[in-house]
Amino acid sequence: MNSIEFPLIDRTTQNSVISTTLNDLSNWSRLSSLWPLLYGTSCCFIEFASLIGSRFDFDRYGLVPRSSPRQADLILTAGTVTMKMAPSLVRLYEQMPEPKYVIAMGACTITGGMFSTDSYSTVRGVDKLIPVDVYLPGCPPKPESILDAITKLRKKISREIHEDQTSSLSSQRENRCFTTNHKFYVERSTHTGNYDQVLFHQPPSTSEISSDTFFRYQKVQYPPRNEIVN
């Protein structure tokens, strides 16, 4: 068998001690093993599928796609987000453990794209729902751009401090929507359009409606049987 020698490592670490901080060790472990939750809704997600092949080999970044949000620390949104899908996206984000990150991929995810002008059912930017760490523009963005976004996210994680991250969580939650018992509402609105009224509309309960509404009818006057109507 061929022996593999590391003379440089043996010479430098034989009588030395490697010291680091717990914060740097935690950041290094998280940036080296990002487990993404893939949330693709349209054509932008096809570009991400090409990263799985041997040409780009996204496994070298430690990316392991997960099907459960409880096992993921990164959610990658690609495609148009509609009003009906918004509560599901926020619920998936809430089920992810801390610390968690978001990459917004494509023009439709970032601004609504070509559906943002006259569409009544499109969310004009996923940052209206969840906080975004990296914006990846394009229609669709190339696989090289996706790798560049992942690299920028890894650099951001490497510079994080645990105290700063925990203090910023409260400020992030003030600007985002969240769900409790499947009732979608917002703590402080950041919307600029009037479509948020449709998104957060809660229909009245049937118990508040009087029974006369369901049994309301008008009495119909029928002609006598012996009368002939022309």
UniProtKB/Swiss-Prot annotation:
Subcellular location: Plastid, Chloroplast thylakoid membrane
GO cellular component, as recorded: chloroplast thylakoid membrane; respiratory chain complex I
Record text on cofactor binding: Binds 1 [4Fe-4S] cluster.
Signal peptide: none
InterPro entries hit by this protein: NADH_UbQ_OxRdtase-like_20kDa, NADH_UQ_OxRdtase_20Kd_su
Keywords, sorted A to Z: 4Fe-4S, Chloroplast, Iron, Iron-sulfur, Membrane, Metal-binding, NAD, NADP, Plastid, Plastoquinone, Quinone, Thylakoid, Translocase, Transport
Necessary cofactors: [4Fe-4S] cluster
Complex formation: NDH is composed of at least 16 different subunits, 5 of which are encoded in the nucleus.
Family: Belongs to the complex I 20 kDa subunit family.
Name used for this protein in its record: NAD(P)H-quinone oxidoreductase subunit K, chloroplastic
UniProt gene name: ndhK
